[in-house]
């Protein structure tokens, strides 16, 4: 099974979105993410975390495992981040010579 790095992109940084959200919006957002991770099940290798820095368009990451990038994209249907941005799916390759 291959591993895939997901990069969560949006026009506004994760820190800016969180700073502008009410506590209720933050709780609802976390509930949606928790529900998605539960649905993805054993495909989730690392739930990831928010990120900061760079050009601000990457707000976080996760690592999933699946048979193919298409299988990952299928898992991403209904992902809460797609309401505010896009998700890059990058296969993590073994180091050269490994």
Model-assigned labels for residue ranges:
Residues 1-98:
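Conserved, structured core segments of small domains
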């Amino acid at each position: 099974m291959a591993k895939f790095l997901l990069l969560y992109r949006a026009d506004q940084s994760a820190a800016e979105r969180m700073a502008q959200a009410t506590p209720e919006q933050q709780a609802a957002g976390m509930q949606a993410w928790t529900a998605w991770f539960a649905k993805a099940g054993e495909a989730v290798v690392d739930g990831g975390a928010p990120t900061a820095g760079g050009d601000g368009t990457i707000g976080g990451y996760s690592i999933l495992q699946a048979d193919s990038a298409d299988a990952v994209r299928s898992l991403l249907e209904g992902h809460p981040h797609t309401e505010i941005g896009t998700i890059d799916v990058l296969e993590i390759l073994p180091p050269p010579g490994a």
